[in-house]
Amino acid sequence: MAFRAVLDAANRVSAERGPTNAALGRNASGAAARDDRFRSFRRASDDALDAVRRIGPFGTSLAALEERLAAARREVDRLLDRPRAEREPEAVERAIEAMFSAYDAAQPLLDTAMTALLADDPQLVGHAMVARMLGEMRDYAGRLGSHLVIAIAQMQPPRPAQQAAFEQTRGRVLQLWPLIGQQASSSREPAIVEAGRAVERDFIQGGMALIDATLARLRNGDFDLTPESFTRDIVPHFVAIERLRDAFVDSTIRQLDAGRQGAQRALVLASLATLLALAVELLLLLAGRQL
């Protein structure tokens, strides 16, 4: 399913920021800075993009995403090849923002995949929209963490521009969740309802509390933490968002399959009706010959 493959690829590109942030804050340089998790997340992004390529022709949209991701990785790699003391805070900030840009380049792909899905069954628009909104929410959640990583790396409270970007991102998360949460809590599917509760518990309450507490520490001049330690603590809180997104995608696929089966049943019934009409005509023809 193209929609799921593109959502997965966009999520992998977004999730790659976690180990990237940790690596940028690590004292090691060169190959030592690129631990197994860092390498595995890059491979996962590449594999997900390859899966999209195999599904169908996405043309320039896929190429643009891959080029943007490659450019962002080059910025990251240039910094990782230097000792940590030589990684200028502004350069770290630019590298993280370049990774933001890589995710943004996935939007045309998502538009194309969603349009194709709805062409198959327009009634799936509700579930498809929620799944996409959850992808956006997962990315915004990760950006909140990345904004704090920038301040941690610079060992100073967020500057006004950084604070504004943080608050804007936080606002988007808080705007999305009531819309998504209402859809999850009112679902007839127990898996979606339970996954929604997990997001409320693990991220809205737990993850946001950790983010707000970390921001307060930075504002108070407490820099006794590292990008790696903060990333290690915050990333598990994002898992619930991904699971809820997957639950909606699974439901969308089931509805699509059910719709196709319904269409196949309708086709069979139509064929039987045609055969019955032909049989009646044949019987009438034979009866007419006998008269």
For each predicted feature, which ranges?
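Hydrophobic alpha-helical segments
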Residues: 1-291
